[in-house]
């Protein structure tokens, strides 16, 4: 207790002086408590002293107990060791007896088996000498099993002697079997009734011998069977290509006539199968020798007949023996190339096709299961893995060039014929609006593909595919030649075409048919490549590509659509000339729309409905975009070709401009293709708004004309502004102050505009039309001159709308560039 606590305690016990009288009793009480505590402490100390002595005694007792326990454990361990020694002494004698018993048992068993082996070998020797094949086969199996037990005793002289004796017996059996089989096929089987049974029993002996004996016997039999074949067909009379079918008739007749006799062979030997393999190898060698040694080019008919019979024979072998790679039935796929069907018909046809294939596969699996169940392995050589397909026919591959040349000549001649007979029109009610020549062309190609598919799926098919490419390119060139030539205008400048194009209503329909036919050829050529890549050997699949052909047709589509635009431009030239001849400076009042506007409406009303009906939405969209991009700038530039405009004349021209704009905006509904209306309307409004803005500048007062021009044409140029002042009828002296003020404030850009760069109206002779007289030059033109445009259009490989948008963007952007592939093409 600290000092402060003691003071608090005293103050608490004696708060007043009167309470001090209780100090003495309190002191006595405390002293009594102290004495009691001291006595308690002393008692505890004494008790603790007595406890320490007790603990020492207990520890000593525990130590003695541990020592006694350790002594007892040692005694137990010693007794256990003694017991173990006694047990080992007892078991030592028992183990010796056990080993002795085991050795005696093994010796007795070995001696018994040795006795059996000696007896079996002696019996086998007797059976071999008597040619008792059936009994010898069973005995040989037993001897082989007994010999397996003596593998560990190979060095024992008696065992070595027995093995040598057994090998000699096996050689005797082998020689007897081979000797007996040499009489097979000589006619003795009819004289000796038991010969076939003896040979059948000898096959059991061969199975019991080493596998090499069976291989040697089968090979000898096949070689002996084919000896007469070699002698017959190596002679000068039958060693000809036109006698090939007789070779296969010989082996089929041989198998058919000897089918009962050859049943002596176990089914697991697959003797007819092995015979056919050797026959195919020998036939391939002979046929290849005939083809190589031919002095003259083979007649295609004979060559194809020999190849056809060879392929059919290989299919028969593959069907009979199996083991080939499963082939995909592509006849239906070839028929589907270039078909035009709606979705419901297409889905139904696909479903039926795959149901048919599934049923065929199920039937094949069931047949295979049934064959395995019945054990008829002669019909299906399970696990043989030998592919008869191409075993003989592949030797024809290097010599089929005449066939490919004939196919190419036939296809090219047919192409010339169908193009000459083409009416360049489509029957009413046709859904695809495709020229009959394109569908007929692919019909001929499909027939050619079917013919080749039955003959070859390797180099020959690949060479034929190259022929298809050349034929399709030739057709693309003919479509290209059919398009009208020449052209003028902005689109012509952008695409490198010069001269005007005059097209009639029939010409417009023909151009649309060419576009649709080129699109059909583009799509169908891709399907053709896919089908060929599926059926051709995988080594050639990577080379099956129709991208070049598709690019050719894409180029035809691009040029055809641009030609349509150029044709309408040519029709508009007359109306544009009428517009410049209107006396705009002397008009007295604003009336209805001018005659040239009605002329533009007549041109569009006569062409647009037909084009909208015949062209697909994608191509019609491209046509509209190019038409709008052509008419807008042409109309704008044509205003500058006019002479002086009075205020009334400018108001009339503004009314005409709005009428032309309305006419252009009505084109999608006129063509009944409203899906393109939104983007097209925005495009037309943008292009025609420039012409409206120009007329608003012309109508503005003299004192504000510069400000109005700068506001409406931030990119305007001084040259264009000066031309506007001339249209307003200002004299040179009056123009100068306005021009000085305009130049003082400065335009937004100094780049010369298209309208300012246009020459003054003057008669210009038409440029010579585009003409290509050489087909090779035409093909080069398609592949080279329009290659950039074709790639920009991205029409190849099915791309459509996106490609045309890219083409539009590229051509528009190229106008102001001084270099680059597009600019160089435009300047060509």
Curated annotation (Swiss-Prot):
One Pfam family named in its UniProt record: Vps53_N
Gene Ontology biological process terms from the UniProt entry: heat acclimation; plasma membrane organization; protein transport; response to heat; response to osmotic stress; retrograde transport, endosome to Golgi; retrograde vesicle-mediated transport, Golgi to endoplasmic reticulum
Listed name of the protein: Vacuolar protein sorting-associated protein 53 A
Tissue: Present in pollen. Mostly expressed in vegetative tissues, including leaves, siliques, and stems, and flower buds, and, at lower levels, in roots and mature flowers.
Reported function: Acts as a component of the GARP complex that is involved in retrograde transport from early and late endosomes to the trans-Golgi network (TGN). The GARP complex facilitates tethering as well as SNARE complex assembly at the Golgi. Required for vesicle trafficking involved in plasma membrane protein composition. Probably involved in pollen tube elongation and other polar growth. Confers basal tolerance to long-term heat stress and osmotic stress, by acclimation of the plasma membrane.
UniProt topology in membrane: Peripheral membrane protein
Subunit structure, as described in the record: Component of the Golgi-associated retrograde protein (GARP) complex, composed by VPS52, VPS53 and VPS54. Interacts directly with VPS52 and VPS54.
Superkingdom, taxonomy of origin: Eukaryota
Result of altering residue 393 to Y: In hit1-1; reduced tolerance to both heat and water stress, lethal at 37 degrees Celsius. Altered vesicle trafficking leading in changes in the plasma membrane components
Keyword hit for Chloroplast: no
Phenotype on disruption: Lethal when homozygous. In hemizygous plants, male-specific transmission defect.
Organism: Arabidopsis thaliana
Family under the similarity heading: Belongs to the VPS53 family.
Major subcellular location class: cytoplasm
Keywords: Coiled coil, Cytoplasm, Endosome, Golgi apparatus, Membrane, Protein transport, Transport
A cellular component annotation (GO) from this entry: cytosol
